[in-house]
Amino acid sequence: MQEVNQLINSENVYSNIKKDNFGKMLLDKINSYGESDYSYYWTYSHIGFDKYEEGLAILAKGKVCDVEDFYCTSHQDIHSISSRKILKVTLEINNQTIEFYSCHMNLPTCEDENIRENLYNLVNHTDDSNLKIFMGDFNTDYFNQKKDYNMIIEMGLFDTYEMAQKKDDGVTVYKNISGWED
């Protein structure tokens, strides 16, 4: 999950997780249905709107082998919106080690960061042969930013939307949101 925020001033519940952390609230709801096999991991990249710790989360079910967060950007300051962390959770599933990465990349128009370099840092974070699944928001519009979209594909990544046998129209956000203003 991306943009899993919590208010800076909220009460700490455990580790770096606060009472109003959406992922924690989701896990609590899942647990209320009698599920208890999920683990929750969260980290944040930067402060948003002067009041939120803006972060990434992964809910994992199964044997967790490793958890790591790292910056893919040259900016690594929580006070810079250009700072982007990646959350990686490694699971063992059916005797196979699989790395899951929750990503929220900068917009291609970000002038403070080299998007190609950020993607390179992400894709080449580990050199092992484990299956890697990159999930999240790459902030690239397939319809209007073909060059940027193709750059992602040229890095060796597969777009699961393109691989799907059944598809909708491919648009998840139909109007401008914060950061997309003209």
What are the language-model segments listed below?
Residues 24, 28-31, 37-182:
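Active-site regions of metal-assisted phosphoester/phosphodiester hydrolases
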Residues 16-20, 113:
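Soluble non-cytosolic domains of exported or imported proteins
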Residues 1-17, 160, 164:
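Active-site neighborhood of divalent metal-dependent phosphoester/pyrophosphate hydrolases
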